Amino acid sequence: MSSGNIWKQLLEENSEQLDQSTTETYVVCCENEDSLNQFLQQCWQIDEGEKVTNLEPLGFFTKVVSRDEENLRLNVYYAKSPLDAQTLQFLGVFLRQMETSQIRWIFLLDWLLDDKRLWLRQLRNSWAALEEAQVAPFPGGAVVVVLNPSHVTQLERNTMVWNSRRLDLVHQTLRAACLNTGSALVTLDPNTAREDVMHICALLAGLPTSRPVAMLSLQSLFIPHGADSIGKICTIAPEFPVATVFDNDFVSSTFEAAIAPELTPGPRVPSDHPWLTEPTNPPSEATAWHFDLQGRLATLYRHLGDSNKAISVTQHRFHKPRSEDYAYEFELPSKHPTIRDLIRSAAADSPNDVADSIDGLMDGIVQRNVH
């Protein structure tokens, strides 16, 4: 066979790959390999041997999938979040021949990871890097995917940090960030129905979808570009500063200050696992925040026992519990009225005596477990 025929045969065999009309290009930004593999497996059903083992500095794989009885080649680049100038420079080597409108950007956030207080900063820094490199996605060209939202229930039940007001803050902040950048916002859980996953895949590709918009629950979001608005976001809290969520003041003094740092990130845990694993490294003062329930109860009972020994005193009253009694290690934000009255322990504002504080604390625990 002549060399000309060999090249002709090679071109024919790979003509599908060369046809740009049957190719879609994605850039996936994430913090963790396990998060990326979960996303790739659910959306594009990668095989075990195709799983990602390293995010740095840049990764790539290609896969042929079927959509509407047509074979489609996916070219997927992945990079560690947040994006920076160097990563975009590496990407530019591969994507410089493509129009910006041909590239779909995906930003993964994961409730199972201990970086939730940094979500907003990561999104802001990634977007700033894209704009500086003049490759920012066009409106509708990016999607923020929040993985494992069912873990929110575990956080509510097992921690003193994640109450409804903090969750509302995350809810409004993510929607505002996506509205301001022209991005879509969806949640993806391991138990998400396959039909819903297909709608998410269509949204990732920028295709129309018949799935109804869902924006009321933080655990079930499906908000295509153009479906949200400032008015809809502000139905949760009317004074929420939608337009300024990327400002330094809001990022550091409101969002990050309101969400307490968690223990040093350890291994990922499944959604049915207790909230925290044992940390691989001891937490520092800057990264640890906890509420020692057993220790607090022991202290209250000890004070109550001491007071009962003073028989000569007719009535025993104790000081009003202060915030430092509860070992808070961060200052609640106060710059925005909407955020100003984030949770304090109910006992910290109670005018009752210590015995009532114990009863109130135990009632709260029972109510949380019932719900």
UniProtKB/Swiss-Prot annotation:
Residue ranges of coiled coil: none
Highest taxon of the lineage: Eukaryota
Location(s) in or outside the cell: Cytoplasm, Cytoskeleton
GO cellular component: cytoplasm; dynein complex; microtubule
Keyword vocabulary terms for this entry: Cytoplasm, Cytoskeleton, Dynein, Microtubule, Motor protein
Record's function text: Component of the cytoplasmic dynein which acts as a motor for the intracellular retrograde motility of vesicles and organelles along microtubules. May play an important role in the proper orientation of the mitotic spindle into the budding daughter cell yeast. Probably required for normal progression of the cell cycle.
Protein name: Cytoplasmic dynein intermediate light chain DYN3
Species annotation: Eremothecium gossypii (strain ATCC 10895 / CBS 109.51 / FGSC 9923 / NRRL Y-1056) (Yeast)
Gene that produces this protein: DYN3
